[in-house]
Amino acid sequence: MPRHKLIASESDVSIEVDEGKDKESCVYYVEVEENCERGKIKQASRDGKRRRERNGETRRKASEKRTNEGESKKAEKKHEKGHRTARKAGEKHGKRQRRKNAGEEDAEDKSSKEKKNMKNEKNKTLKLEEEKEKDVRKKKRKHVKNEEDETNHEKTKQHLKEEKRRKKRKKPETTSESESKSESESASESESKNSPAVGVLGSLTPEELENLKEAVEERKKLITQLKGKPWPMRRKLVVLRESQEFVEKYEGALGKGKGRKLYAYKVMMMKKWMKFQRDFENFKTACIPWEMKIKEIESHFGSSVASYFIFLRWMYGINMILFGLTFGLVMVPEALMGKPYGSLPRKTVPREEEASAMNFAVLWDFGGYAKYSVLFYGYYNSQRAIGWLKFRMPLSYFLVGVGTVAYSYMVVIRTMARNANEEGGGDDTSFNFSWKTFTSWDYLIGNPETADNKFASITTSFKEAIVEEQESRKDDNIHLTRFLRVLANFLVLCCLAGSGYLIYFVVRRSQKFALEGLENYGWWERNEVNMVMSLLGMFCPMLFDVISTLENYHPRIALQWQLGRIFALFLGNLYTFIIALMDAIQLKRAEEEIVKKNMTIWQANLYNGTVPDNSTAPPLTVHPADVPRGPCWETMVGQEFVRLIISDTMTTYITLLIGDFMRAVLVRFLNNCWCWDLEYGFPSYSEFDVSGNVLGLIFNQGMIWMGAFYAPCLPALNLLRLHVSMYLQCWAVMCCNVPQERVFKASGSNNFYMAMLLVILFLSTLPAIYTIVSIPPSFDCGPFSGKPRMFDVIQETLETDFPAWFSKVFSYASNPGLVLPFLLLLVLAIYYLQSTSKTYKRVNMELKKKLQAQNEENKKKNKLAALKAASDLEQARKAGEQRRNSISDLGVNEENPESHVSSSHTSRPPASRGHTSSGHLPGHPQQPQKNSKKR
């Protein structure tokens, strides 16, 4: 073929070159038309190869040129860089030479800096090496922790699975579930103690975290309900410790980040606050005076005897406040800032009394120097302001006297209201003995003496409950008891009338002795009134106690009747004494008028006289002891009350020592050598007289309230008396007395004591108010001397120390036209509140009756349900026995058919001849045979 035919045209061949690649590595694609022949294709391929080779050579040459040009450019750049570095080095060298020429100090600094830099580099390298070592150690620790967390995670998963299985097996309503959960959680807790809770919780699933939260909540509930569990104390302590550790371990760890820290802080503060509250309660209990003594007495003698000592402690607290007011605001300011002894006639012993002023008999009667001291009313000066503080002595004296009475009213009424609120809930008498049997013991007692006291207290409480139950079920002859009670009241009235007449007779005799002069009589005539009152107060309660045996009252009601009778006796004696004092006051005032007239004559004679001409007389100076003075009836009243308190105290203590201590010694040491049994016969050991001692306290306090205005020392004397009485009577009760034969619960007696104390407070303030308002004070003694009435000190203070408008407002407010409507409004408010309280009480009683009726119905339903369940169980048991007997009879009949046939002619079954079945006697037919025949 010709060559031009074999060469492909441009339309038949096209060459494509990849532009993204180098020319050397280009790939040529030849596309030939499909209609060309094979020869043409081969020729074209050969031509293409040749062309490719030519093009490759041209491209190689071009690339070599390019590489040569690039290398030349790089060499030029390197040469330029070398010139630049040489220039810079020259410049640096010049700078160094200049610095060297400037001075050698800069070189030294640079060398030191270079050294420091070297050291810093070395330290950095050392630190880097240490950090690398630490990183290696941390990695090792993390690896160990991860392994521990994985093991703990597996353990917690296993325990949670076990808890789920136990929850599925047991019902959620039973109480045993909480116990089993507590045991499983305690086991899981003991295993996971050594591992941190946070790491374990981080690897738990949400479901497992919820289960753990539920477990924590259940542990909390278990801690709150642990007291009500019927478990031994050892088990309670173990469960409590385990639950607290579990809650502390997982509760705070369930939070996240700041919340977890805040929760931990709250828990810590809550624990500290609870500990502080517990310690503060213990501190308050430790600060209560005589608490352990009273508890010991209550454990051996019951709550009735302990109520007296509690009442005595309460009275001690009131007298402590009264003593603080009188001592701090009356006695101390007068002793420190008032005029000293001997400066005024009222502060000086008269000349005729100086010889006997320090005798013991005189001081025992509070005369002599004791009379002219801060202990009594007459010593105080009537000056408005005393000392550098300008202390208003008359105003302070009056306000303290009124304030002590007001404080006493407030405290007594508040205590009565609190006792009424405590007693208003009612007593739950259902299952009384069961509660006492199973809940009385305190398992935290660790002292043998405390355990003995608790045992005695439980025994006494059982005796009290038995007496209450017996009295509620007692059914006596009504007509006989009414007759005996009327007779007892008639005898008591006769005793009261006789004691009143005796006191009136003695008072009239004492007035006759006073007119004739007490110096002419002995000790008994001078103290006849006080001694008769003390003896009546000692023997009349014993007579009332004997009479009360006829009435056959409940011990608590008998105590209240006894207290009421002794109250009437003491009240009559007290008011008879007050009437006698009023008569003595009138005599003193008449004597005072005579002294006033004599004072004018004495002063006239003192300053009138004859003097010779052209001479000067020396100034007249009269010693305060030589100045005539009035009788000062206020000091006389204060002395009488102080003597009465002292005589009553001494009578009480002597009676205690002779009537209790000597009697107990006689019975204890002469019982073995006497004709009869002294312990159970006459005289026997004495019982503690609750009623007499309580009334003694109440009337003693009434005399303090009545006489404290005229003798500021009375609260201090009463405080000392109560303090000594507490220790002496506690000792006498525990050593010399025996418990009462009929021990009763005195829960309602405390408010009865308060009611009598309130009556005595009211009756004792009436005479003091009468003397303050109606009787004018003495002219030469006391802080109110020179005033027409004692309460005028208020009006004087308003006029001198306050603005005019304030005194006008006070005068308008004290107008009877405003006071009487205000009092009427108060009476109406009291009546309204009393009526509403009665309705509330009635509603409460009805509600209580309904609740009791519902309780009785529930008891009946429970009994019927229990009987039904017991009958069902009995029927099921009988049915099971019948089935077992019938099955055994059928088996015997199948094994021995001949014996069964032969036994049909006998009167008893063959089973009774051999081994008898349970619950049947041999020789009697059994019911299972009938059941087998029916089958």
From Swiss-Prot:
Bilayer topology annotation: Multi-pass membrane protein
GO molecular function ontology, one term from the record: mechanosensitive monoatomic ion channel activity
Domain of life of the organism encoding this protein: Eukaryota
GO cellular component, one term: stereocilium bundle
The keyword tRNA processing belongs to this UniProt entry's keyword annotation: no
Cellular compartment(s): Cell membrane
Keywords, in A-Z order: Cell membrane, Coiled coil, Ion channel, Ion transport, Membrane, Transmembrane, Transmembrane helix, Transport
Gene Ontology annotations of biological process type: cellular response to mechanical stimulus; detection of mechanical stimulus involved in sensory perception of sound; vestibular reflex
Keyword Ion transport: yes
Compositional bias per record (Basic and acidic residues), positions renumbered to this chain: 37-47, 54-79, 109-136, 152-163, 172-184, 874-886
Region annotated Disordered, chain positions: 1-21, 37-204, 874-935
Family: Belongs to the TMC family.
PANTHER family reported in the protein's UniProt record: TRANSMEMBRANE CHANNEL-LIKE PROTEIN 1 (PTHR23302:SF18), TRANSMEMBRANE CHANNEL-RELATED (PTHR23302)
Annotated function: Pore-forming subunit of the mechanotransducer (MET) non-selective cation channel complex located at the tips of hair-cell stereocilia. Highly permeable to calcium and likely transports monovalent cations.
Subunit structure: Interacts specifically with isoform CD3 of PCDH15A (via cytoplasmic domain).
Protein's UniProt name: Transmembrane channel-like protein 1
Species this protein is from: Danio rerio (Zebrafish)
Organism phylogeny: Eukaryota, Metazoa, Chordata, Craniata, Vertebrata
Name of the gene this protein is made from: tmc1
